[in-house]
Design a protein with these regions (language model features):
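Conserved small/polar residues in nucleotide/adenosyl-binding loops
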Residues: 189-191
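Residue-level detector of anion-binding/catalytic polar loops
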Residues: 45, 77, 126
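Short, surface-exposed acidic-centric catalytic microdomains
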Residues: 22-65
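Amphipathic, non-transmembrane alpha-helical scaffold segments
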Residues: 7, 60, 64, 68, ...
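Membrane-interface segments of envelope glycosyltransferases acting on lipid-linked substrates or membrane lipids
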Residues: 2-5, 14-15, 49, 118-119, ...
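N-terminal Rossmann-like dinucleotide-binding module
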Residues: 1-36
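Donor/substrate-binding cores of folate-linked one-carbon enzymes
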Residues: 20, 31, 42, 82-185
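A glycine-rich beta-strand to alpha-helix segment
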Residues: 59-91, 96
């Protein structure tokens, strides 16, 4: 199975995937970011499809088609989103239906969207965590593959809680990716 990682930030999730000895065929980024340096250090091919090239009236469908075209060049079977900052459109999810994994910093279905950590704090929960799920056109709505709980401390702020969630995520996500790839190879997952 050929895995692509989509990243937009520091590359810490990509690093966790590599550190777990998961082969990554290519990393695709949507902007200049720190992940590129990390990818180059690990000698993984890196593609940039900059969202700024799609004008002030961002064409999400065209961008998604360009992402699919770029990944097709690498014969990608499975995609792991790793802090990817652009919401993709139907052409992407049609091309990789049931084979796009994502991680979210909350225990879905609670606190979906961009501000899961902040929302958990504002609601006063004592437990939050991270979720690995199949990404679909409906953001944070896909089937849940794995979750891990993280305690919320009384003195937590968004940054401290998010860092503990990310630490847990860096263990959970690679383990879930490995299991997903193995199950897919053994045809235990039907796409």
């Amino acid at each position: 199975m050929r895995l692509a990682v989509l990243a937009s930030g520091t590359g810490s999730i990509y690093k966790a995937i590599i550190d777990a000895n998961i082969d990554v065929a290519v990393v695709l980024v949507d902007r200049l970011c720190a992940a590129i340096d990390l990818v180059n250090t690990n000698q993984t091919p890196c593609i940039t499809v900059e969202r700024t090239q799609f004008g002030p009236e961002f064409d999400r469908t065209k961008f998604s088609c360009d992402v699919v075209a770029a990944l097709t060049e690498f014969n990608i079977d499975v995609v792991a989103m790793a802090g990817f900052g652009t919401v993709l459109d139907a052409p992407f999810f049609e091309a990789y239906e049931g084979r796009v994994l994502n991680t979210h910093p909350a225990l879905l279905p609670s606190f979906p969207g961009w501000h899961g950590v902040r929302d958990a704090l504002q609601h006063g929960v004592k437990i939050t965590g991270c979720t690995v799920h199949i990404a679909t056109l409906d953001v944070d709505e896909g089937p849940i593959l794995a979750q891990a709980a993280v305690e919320v401390f009384d003195d937590d702020n968004e940054a401290t809680l998010h860092e503990r969630i990310k630490s847990t995520e860096r263990d959970l996500y690679p383990a879930t990716i490995k299991k997903f790839l193995t199950d897919l190879e053994l045809s235990l997952i039907h796409i």
